[in-house]
């Protein structure tokens, strides 16, 4: 992981790709030798074609493979795995696990900020002109993922303001969107910055939750 971020910081050319259908089917076939069913939780169908591919491939497996389309990615996708394990331990079938996870797909929210606008420009999410202006003015976009879409949430100046904006957004979600299930929510964090920087932000995030 550290090597990846070193290359990213060194301006190396990095791209992503979904796994090939052959690799997916090989893995499923190996798992079904020892297990009766599979719950597959791919990243959000709105952000990758991996989910659509898995859904298509699963049609040849007589419902032994249940593909969950619950619009999750990153830390919320990871939490879906933990939720699936808990449901399995409660005796739920693969189909029942899929139904529960998809029913709860909107009970998640992600806020993201980036240190460089390079990859948003490269991916076509902002224009080269906007990227140039944003870099000069030290503008940090805060992006939001709720459901299948990655949307602009705010545009602020500086890293500190971006972190504060995300913490405020988390607090608002817990008091508004997730008020009825607030006690059941899980706070997660993914980062590429220094451990010292993330430790402070992680502490503030937990303080925000505990104050509610």
What kind of feature is each model-predicted range?
Residues 23-51:
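N-terminal glycine-rich phosphate/adenylate-binding segment common to multiple enzyme folds
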Residues 1, 37, 46-66, 72-204:
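Mixed-charge interfacial surface used for oligomerization/domain docking
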Residues 202-205, 209-212:
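Single conserved hydrophobic/aromatic residue that forms the stacking wall/gate
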Residues 13-20, 42-46, 73:
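Short secondary-structure transition/capping motifs
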Residues 1-23:
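N-terminal glycine-rich anion-binding loop in soluble enzyme alpha/beta folds
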Residues 8-12, 31, 104, 124:
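Alpha-helix boundary/capping residues
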